[in-house]
Design a protein with these regions (language model features):
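A contiguous, basic/glycine-rich beta-loop/short-helix subdomain that forms a polymer-engagement track
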Residues: 283-323, 328-329, 615
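Hydrophobic anchor at the beta1->P-loop junction of P-loop NTPases
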Residues: 766
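Conserved DEDDh/DEDDy metal-dependent 3′-5′ exonuclease domain
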Residues: 81-82, 95-106, 110-121, 131-205, ...
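Acidic, Mg2+-coordinating catalytic module of metal-dependent nucleases/exonucleases
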Residues: 171-240, 246, 255, 438, ...
Length: 770
């Protein structure tokens, strides 16, 4: 927002700021009205600047794409906003295909749209003020998913555009960082937008400098986060307690607890919406943080695992001389992200600490880097099955899973390492086994217990992104080499990564000392489990490999056939590959505590058996149903029919499962009915079984692919091969040109029907209604 000639003007970004943070929106207005009294904004964020530069580059790519499509473009220029507005109107009237950086305005709202794209009207469409065309707004974003703020901005631009052309565009579009284009129907979001805009303008009209919104009521603080945090710290606000959520703060507030001191001194045991063990943990956390204030080394307390649960230090495996301490440096500003440095601390045969690193500066190198890392750690695990790979938080595991899916490599090895719990997340161990007098449980906070402050040139993961971006720019100019031996910047990043890996190793040593001191045995997985691979799957893998070899052989002389063989080969593994993330998520959930599952909307924690007798839900039912009660304030989707019981196994060693009987349950009032072959325990937590059996689709794909390998499916004589090769449809007696050229709906339908009837072992794509 800004003032011009005493008049306030707003942008679509002001609306999204208000939507996400009433506090930040108020502060923006206050800084305009009372600049002399306003606190300083947050310092410029180098990462945000880098993201902005990437955004401009993304817009240029889209602009180039329009040019390659043969569209006429005009980029709006002008000495003033009034000039730019008039030039935009002139460009719209002249009918350019694409207008770049169009200046739009309506009343007190104004802004620049990345692109206005021309839409030519069909016969019978209502004309706009421009004639038989109008424009729709396209916005370019780096994100890979559509966010609510993007949609609000587009609606605002579309409303301004409607005032200029007389027609509200039917669609608006977002070009995402992945390259995908999302077209959104304006009418589906417009009512929400108008309501939001009305609330925003009402607040602006009623603005008072003495009525600042409480920063605690906003999830973010925009450019004023430093000021907001100081306000809350001055109030001793609950937000500073490690691990506390906004929902928990609100529930504690309703119980009369507003400050960290009040919570630390509280004897509260029960309040609506919070489990007693959660309250107990929050009180203990508040106490130890207050007691640690001003200390060089924070206080800590070791937590023994609750009865019947394997948490905290009980998850820390014994020492192996082949252990690896692992950390990745990632660069999220590339499309899809780039995991560019895989660092590992380990010990050689003489017991000396060593470091090995794998680097990648593009996707081809990333694939090789991933394969090299997995091959190295897998060989060490084969040599000693008691060896583990230690990392802090989930980033490293997520990266391995992402790259395995992206490149289709190392599937067996990653599966085996995950299945046998070779990766050990130290964050889970610390969070479950340690009470720490710090406001966060990041490794930078935890390492205050066992090492001195760092002295590396690169200070944080966020800073490493900026430093690596700087290296990429200098490397493009030929001023930096592409190895740490030829680049000081890469050497600094490597030093930071070594420090991270060494810190991870030192944390394991420190945790192991605490484990021994408090006599907490390891209860994790010891035996190596090999998956039973059905003969059907091994046959499929052999077929895949034969087709990939065939694709390589045909690549130069018959590229179409080579592409067909490659596509068919990867189709064979599609369903098995797609099921892996489901099982990984299941393993992750089954490794969590009852308390942790409470925050998962697909799970249901702490269900307690009611006094209702077990019963048969139907006269013909073979298994009994059991009623449980749970805290109705716990958010639960109830989307699955089958659930695993956390930590419970059957007599045969299988994970116990139950069936959710929705018709017998009353979730709104905290009652759920579960059907089971065996009687479940009196207290249970539910983990969803999200696997959907794809059969018989994989078998049908097998049949098609085997037919291709055996020569029964021939390119040029098969509809499915035509489709995979993107070949033009073969239609008997049809020459080149439109298949259904008529604009008359009835005649066009007849032409389409005739074309389908005359298909010659080919296909025809039909665009149906939305």
């Amino acid at each position: 927002m800004y003032k011009k000639s005493g008049q306030l003007y707003y942008s679509p970004t002001d609306l999204t700021s208000f939507m996400e943070s009433p506090f930040a929106s108020w502060m923006d207005r206050f800084s305009i009205e009372h600049a002399d009294k306003a606190p300083g904004k947050d310092p410029a964020d180098e990462l945000m600047s880098a993201l902005a530069d990437k955004g401009y580059a993304q817009e240029e790519l889209q602009q180039s794409a329009f040019i390659q499509q043969g569209k006429t473009l005009l980029s709006i220029k002008g000495a003033s906003t009034d000039d730019k507005y008039q030039n935009t109107l002139d460009a719209m009237a002249k009918g350019f295909d694409v207008i770049v950086q169009a200046h739009l305005q309506l009343g007190q709202f104004a802004g620049y749209a990345d692109f206005l794209v021309k839409v030519v009207h069909s016969d019978g469409d209502q004309p706009s003020l421009l004639g038989n065309w109008h424009y729709e707004v396209w916005d370019v974003k780096l994100a890979n998913l559509v966010r609510p703020s993007f949609v609000v901005q587009l609606c605002s631009y579309s409303e301004m555009l409607a005032s200029m052309q007389g027609v509200l565009p039917e669609f608006m579009a977002i070009v995402l960082g992945s390259g995908n284009k999302e077209r959104l129907r304006t009418s589906e979001y417009y009512s929400y937008y108008k309501t939001l805009k009305s609330s925003f303008t009402d607040k602006q009209d009623a603005f008072r400098a003495d009525l600042r919104p409480d920063p605690a009521d906003s999830k973010s603080w925009g450019d004023w986060s430093g000021y907001a945090k100081q306000i809350l710290l001055d109030r001793d606000h609950l937000f500073q307690i490690a691990g506390i959520t906004i929902g928990q703060i609100k529930k504690l507030n309703r119980a009369g607890i507003e400050t960290m001191q009040q919570l630390g001194e509280s004897s509260l045991e029960h309040t609506s919406g919070l489990q007693p063990e959660v309250i107990k943990r929050l009180i203990a956390q508040a106490k130890i943080q207050r007691a640690s204030g001003g200390r060089d080394v924070p206080l800590f307390e070791i937590l023994s695992p609750p009865q019947g649960e394997i948490t905290g230090l009980a998850l820390l495996p014994p020492l192996s001389p082949l252990d690896v301490f692992f950390d990745i440096e990632g660069y999220p500003l590339d499309k899809g992200g780039l995991e560019y440095l895989w660092g590992n601390t380990y010990f050689d045969e003489a017991g000396n600490r060593q470091f090995i690193d794998f680097w990648a500066h593009d996707q081809e190198q990333e694939k090789q880097c991933f394969q090299d890392f997995i091959a190295w750690v897998y060989q060490r695990w084969q040599q000693d099955p008691s060896m583990h790979i230690y990392h802090y938080a989930n980033y490293e595991i997520a990266a391995c899973q992402k790259l395995m899916n992206r490149y289709g490599v190392c599937e067996h090895e990653v599966d085996q390492l995950l299945r046998n719990n070779v990766f050990v997340d130290l964050y889970k161990i610390v969070k479950g086994g340690l009470l720490l007098g710090e406001p966060r449980y990041s490794i930078k906070n935890v390492e205050r217990l066992y090492r001195q402050k760092r002295g590396t040139e690169v200070a944080s993961g966020g800073e490493s992104i900026i430093v690596y971006e700087r290296w990429r720019e200098l490397h493009r100019l030929g001023e930096q080499g592409d190895t740490y031996q030829t680049s000081q910047i890469l050497r600094d990043i490597r030093d930071y990564n070594i420090d991270d890996c060494d810190s991870t190793q030192e944390l394991v040593d420190w945790l192991r000392l605490q484990q021994e001191k408090h006599v907490i045995p390891f209860f994790g997985k010891i035996d190596v489990s090999e998956p039973e691979v059905p003969e059907e799957i091994t046959d499929r893998i052999r077929l895949r490999d034969r087709l990939l070899l065939r694709s390589l052989a045909e690549r130069e002389k018959e590229p179409v056939k080579a592409s067909l063989a490659e596509n068919l080969a990867y189709c064979l593994e599609f369903h098995r590959r797609e099921s892996k993330p489901i099982f990984w998520r299941l393993y992750d959930r089954r490794g969590q505590s009852h308390v942790e599952l409470r925050d998962d909307l697909d799970c249901l924690a702490h269900c307690t058996r009611t006094e209702r007798e077990a019963f048969k839900p139907t006269a013909r039912a073979r298994n009994l149903a059991y009623e449980y009660c749970f805290d109705a304030t716990q958010e639960f989707k109830g989307a699955q029919k089958q659930f695993y019981l956390l930590g419970i196994e059957t007599d045969s060693g299988q994970s116990a499962k139950v069936t959710f009987k929705s018709e017998e349950s009353d979730l709104a009032n905290g009652l759920i009915v579960l059907q089971s072959k065996d009687e479940p325990p009196s207290i249970i937590s539910l983990v969803p079984d999200e696997y959907v059996n794809p059969n018989p689709i994989p078998q049908a794909i097998d049949q098609i692919v085997r037919g291709y390998e055996d020569g029964n499916l021939i390119y040029g004589q098969s509809a499915i091969l035509d489709f995979l090769a993107r070949a033009k449809p073969r239609i008997t007696s049809h020459r080149d040109g439109p298949i259904a050229p008529s604009q008359d709906p009835d005649q066009r339908l007849q032409q389409i029907t005739k074309a389908i009837a005359n298909l010659d072992h080919s296909y025809l794509t039909i665009q149906g209604p939305p």
